[in-house]
Structures are given as C-alpha cells and as structure tokens.
A protein has these predicted regions:
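Alpha-helical substrate-recognition element adjacent to the catalytic core
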Residues: 2-113, 117-118
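Alpha-helical segments flanking ligand/cofactor-binding loops in enzyme cores
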Residues: 78, 137, 156-160
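Active-site phosphate/pyrophosphate-handling residues
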Residues: 95, 134, 157
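Acidic, Mg2+-coordinating phosphoryl-transfer loop and its flanking beta/alpha structural elements
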Residues: 86-91, 144-178
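Residues that cap or flank secondary-structure elements
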Residues: 68, 89, 127-128, 147
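Conserved acidic, metal-coordinating active-site core of Asp-based
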Residues: 98-146
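A generic local structural motif
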Residues: 73-75, 132-136, 153-154
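Short loop/turn microsegments at loop-to-beta-strand junctions
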Residues: 1-2, 149
Length: 178
C-alpha cells in the first residue's frame, strides 16, 4: 500500500493567512513559512497581532471559507485517491482547515490544534514538533511506501523521510536550495 502525503496551504489551497491579511489590512498577518521558517515564531507573531487588533477565530474561519481551491487541486486529489491513500499533513489547525477540507472531499487531515477562549485564539498546540516527518516515519514503520509534496520550508522534513518528495508551487528561493 502507498500513501501520498500533501501539504495543504500553498499546495492545494491558497494561504489562509494571506487572505486574513487582505481582509484586515494587516500586512504582517500575511507572512507564511516561506517568510518565517520557524512555525512557532510565526504563530506567536500572529496571535500577538490578532490580540492587539481584536481579530477572532471566526474572522480566520471566514477567510478560509472564502478561499477557492487552487486550480486543479480537487481533480489532482481525486486522481490520487484512485491509486493511493491520501493524507493531508499540514501545519494548519483543525478549526481553520474545516471549510477547505469540505471542498477537498474530506481527506484524512493531520494538523495542529488551537486553544480558543470566547472566539479568541490564545495559543496553539503542536501535535508534534516535526509532525509531518513523524507521520511519514510512522506510516513507513507500518510498511507503507510514502510520497510527499509541499511548497515551503516546513515540508522539507517530509521529503527527508518519504520515499519520494516533490515541491508543488514552491517559490524558486526555496526549491532551488533543495
């Protein structure tokens, strides 16, 4: 059995936080792991900005729900499903990804969790410091062959342990280094 592990944002969907930035007019919220590779640092910055500006989880969810899949994403995932198990390994959060998972036909999603109080994102909980890498290592320990695709720094950990790894929609400044 073979599994294809895909990143979500930038690979299958636009970046949610770029839409949040556009909706709020706060440019800094549009930064992604392409700009700040340390995801913990990136999330701390986002939470601080959101708190200072009264931006709620519902605002982020509305931004996510307003996004369309990248061209060809749904047909790509459906074609993969004909021959592989498909897993979305993303550094997003369940509360943010729900509307996009619906548009993708609810593939198996492994991601992180937000801590929310009264619609305010107060913190986050990483499933594992290197969740993407850990997931693929776990699948492989069960005898699965794994293929991985993503678009940014945080996807390289998947490529290191997958049987094959591929960049999709990666900026040249990232893909040319690997």
């Amino acid at each position: 059995m073979e599994i294809v592990c895909l990143d979500m944002e930038g690979t299958l969907t636009p970046e949610v936080w770029e839409r949040v930035a556009a909706n709020t007019g706060i440019k800094e919220l549009g930064k992604t792991t392409r700009d700040i590779p340390d995801y913990g640092e990136l999330m701390e910055m986002r939470i601080k900005i959101m708190s200072e500006n009264g931006i709620k989880l519902s605002n982020v969810q509305d931004a996510a729900a307003s996004l369309e899949l990248l061209p060809g994403a749904l047909s790509f995932v459906n074609k993969l499903r004909e021959k592989f198990q498909v897993v979305i390994l993303s550094d997003t959060f369940h509360d943010v990804a729900k509307p996009l998972m619906k548009k993708l036909g609810y593939p198996f999603l492994l991601c992180h969790n937000l801590k929310v109080i009264d619609d305010e994102i107060v913190s986050y909980e990483f499933r594992h410091p290197q969740a993407k890498k850990q997931a693929i290592e776990s699948f492989k320990s069960l005898g699965y062959r794994c293929f991985a695709a993503g678009d940014s720094h945080n996807d390289i950990q998947m490529f290191e342990v997958a049987d094959k790894g591929f960049f999709i929609n990666a900026p040249l400044k990232i893909s040319s280094k690997h």
